[in-house]
Amino acid sequence: MSTPTPPSSGRPKQPFPSSPGSSRRSKILGILVAIIAIAIFIVPVVVSTYTDFAWFRSVDYQGVFMNVIVTRLVLFVVFGLIGALISWLAAFLAYRARPDEIESLGTSSPLAEYRPLIRRNMRPFLVGIPLFVGVITGMIVQSNWRSVLLFLNGSNFGVHDPQFDKDLGFYAFNLPFLQMLVSTFSVLLILAFVINGIGHYLLGSITTGNPRVGEKASISTNARRQLAVIAGVWMLLKAVGYWFDRYGLLTRSHETFTGASYTDINAVLPAQIVLLVISIFVAAMFFVTIVLRDLRIPALAVALMVGSSLTVGLAWPAMLEQFSVNPNRAEKEREYIARNIEATRYAYGIGDDKVTYDRDWGASGDAASKEQKKAVADDSATLSNVRLLDPEVLTPTFTQQQQLRNFYGFPDELAIDRYEVDGKMRDFVVAARELNPNTLDGNQNDWINRHTVYTHGNGFVAAPSRKVDEVARDVGSARGGYPVYTVADLQSMQSGKQGGELKLDVKQPRIYFGPVIASSNQNNSDYAIVGNTEGEPLEYDTDASNYTYTGTGGVDVSNYFNRLMFSAHFESMNMLLTDRIGEGSKILYERDPRERVHKVAPWLTTDSKTYPIVIDGRVKWVVDGYTTLNNLPYSERIGLTDSTADAINPDGVSETQVVDNEVGYIRNSVKAVVDAYDGSVDLYAFDEADPVLKAWRGAFPGVVKPRSEISKELEDHLRYPEDMFKVQRELIAKYHVSDPGVFFQNDSFWSVPTDPTAPQDRQDNAQPPYYVVAADPETNKPSFQLITPFRGLRREFLAAHMSVGSDPDNYGKINVRVLPTGTQTLGPNQAQDTMMSSDEIARERTLLKGTNDLTNGNLLTLPVGDGQILYVEPVYSQRSGQDSAFPKLLRVLVSYNGQVGYAPTIAEALDQVGIKTSSTTDIQEIDGSVVDPTKDGGSGNKGDKGKDADKDKKSKDEQSSDAKGAAGKSDDKGTDTAPEQRVRDAMDKVNKTRESGTFEEFGKALDELDKAVQDLQSER
């Protein structure tokens, strides 16, 4: 039944009164919306802030957290209020200047009928818009907290720029902050102009008029004055911006160099002064409009500004560039290129005080002469330390032989460090045996097991890089070619065999922190809950025992509130409900050493590599920290991600670990040490003269310890960092040139060679630098170095060789051996091609490829003797198609003076290229009798046997007779079939003719071997 409609009374309808029930529902709905908003926006912030503070307190760096939080909060509040106040004033003044009589505004405007409604509802706009602008302003400015702290704590460099004679500290610390202020207030004034103008239009102070009904556009006096003041102040800020832009010219990038060019100094710089004056004039014209009603005055001034910008700012510099500079660029830019060279060398630590150039190195002497070969053979500092173990290749070998359990593992790339053995420096391939969360299997992945049982790794593993357990003359044998391990872990502690030849004394071998343990492929699962003292130990330690963490690191979760907060942080309800958390329980997270360092020192860029060392009876991680600046006058800017990419690390340093990806200044100012057991972080000032580090130490007092606190034991294990070296080598490839004219021509530049031994998909990437022990360029004594070759620009011939010392007495000394111009010394790719095209090598690789996977190790470019280059490359083999197979050292390739050596040992390979080294005993890679490295408690420790290696080793003939044929196959009785015997006989003949026969005899022997292998394969 329909309800009759009441007759209209002509009066406006009144709204229905709301019922008490609907009002209650509205309140409940409002409360629910508020709760949801709090849960979505507020709770995550509270949880994140609380857990972050708890983490910083657990590592005793809460001062860093509070300093950053307070700085950001103050910036947010101050600039948020400023932004809100400016926008509020713009809106309020427009509202206050509204016309009193709306009717007088006319009715033709589309806003005419809405203006009464707008006037009655201005309060939300007067509050909402300023609040929004203030929040956005505060958020943007607080993200620049680093610039603010540097401005407040920066000091002088003691070096001045060549154009304005200002200390570099002005550009590093003051200019970025001042430019941030100018840009912030410029944007706020633009917003204020827009808000004020729209407000006047909406409220009727500005009308557009309607010619069809005879209404003219109009602007009230108050509106004109307010907009003129805002525009005038903005123009004054524009003038200030032009003043600061002058300094920005010194960091401009050009095709050939960085910094102000001839055109910049002689055209752009004067133009900016002219535009600065015009900006002040335009501002004055806007202010004049406050008194005069004629808007044509500021309009003409703005037209003058635009015209001047086009003519003086653009046309004049372009004409000067085209008609004066381009025809004579080499001479015109000479002074400015010289500035660029000097500034770049200073900014990257590659000046004459840091780099020594050995010009025309190797110019005298013939590499084939007896004198040169003797000089090379006598270079025992290099030849007795040739590294045969490639840390990039041997991770599977370390894993198979030293893993112990499926949940342990090693990083994809092992590390190189040096230790003293019997009074001599030796380099070792080193790694910590970490827990690998990605190899947990089956029920091991249960939440209880993953986070409370499998919590830590076990031990430190090292292998001398220059030798293996036994010569692998027979590729088919299970013997030989494997590292000789020195292990310090729980098992070796219990057996009393810890340390081996390194005499390591590790009192705490458990690894709770490391890059592998933090590499979980499950999101938000990098944590372990440890330390529960209630009941029996829960953490897996050995097959016979469990363990309870007793370290000082970690955040207490024994109380329910912390459990609740971390349960929310890691989105894990199990943390709330489990009974595995009790008295003394702690949660360990942020377990990657690099991430820990970056978190406690957020102003540091961290190196992409970290490596374990053993000092003070504990395993610790060393992380290199860099202080950087985005730019510096005349210094070339370089991208850290691109410049640190190579064949091993094609992605370069992670952007999450950098403060500035594009930098114009860098110093390795901090060495950080992270304890692998308790996660404690110690930062040491390594370059105390660095002005940027001084500023950060002022901002965070007490965070970085003085260099004097670096112990002798730690100093002996510090390495020159790879990423720093990569950046420097990319720049030295250009900036070794001192003459601006030659620099402009580009024909004397070098380039980093690509890696010929990399996998096919990475062979276009740069060859990585390598750590080696070799003869020091100055003293000729063994020193731990980082080395890299250079090739000519767009040429493959070797142009130079760069090395840097890492020992305490020569740390950071860069030596560049520059080959004479015009020489044709083979570069790395040419040497690789020469070695791979050798008939003997090609034949053997062809024979082996059917059953074995061959891997070329790192190609080392080693300066030897009095100016000669020796290439050394290990070759590894592993069985094809077998998941359990892992690489072993099979052969050693060498290239010297165009000759190729290929043998099971470095001594034999050197002998084949005519180097009769007196260091044969030192570099012999036999270590006595063979021991299965997977036995002896899993440690594979053979260090004690290694001491008597020279006494116990077999002769080459004995090794050869013990070895099985390269393609032979033994049955259970040790007898061979006829084809197999023919292969053995052919192999013997190849070996004999290689040592004493002619090339013709050697070729025939290879043919016989090839036929014997084919017969064997046919029979099978």
Curated annotation (Swiss-Prot):
Q: Which InterPro entries match?
A: UPF0182 (IPR005372)
Q: Which residues cross the membrane?
A: 28-48, 73-93, 125-145, 175-195, 227-247, 272-292, 300-320
Pfam families linked to this entry:
UPF0182 (PF03699)
Bias (Pro residues): 1-18
Statement: the UniProt record of this protein carries the keyword Transmembrane helix: yes
The ranges of region (Disordered) come to 1-23, 924-998
Q: What is this protein called?
A: UPF0182 protein jk1603
Can you name the source organism?
A: Corynebacterium jeikeium (strain K411)
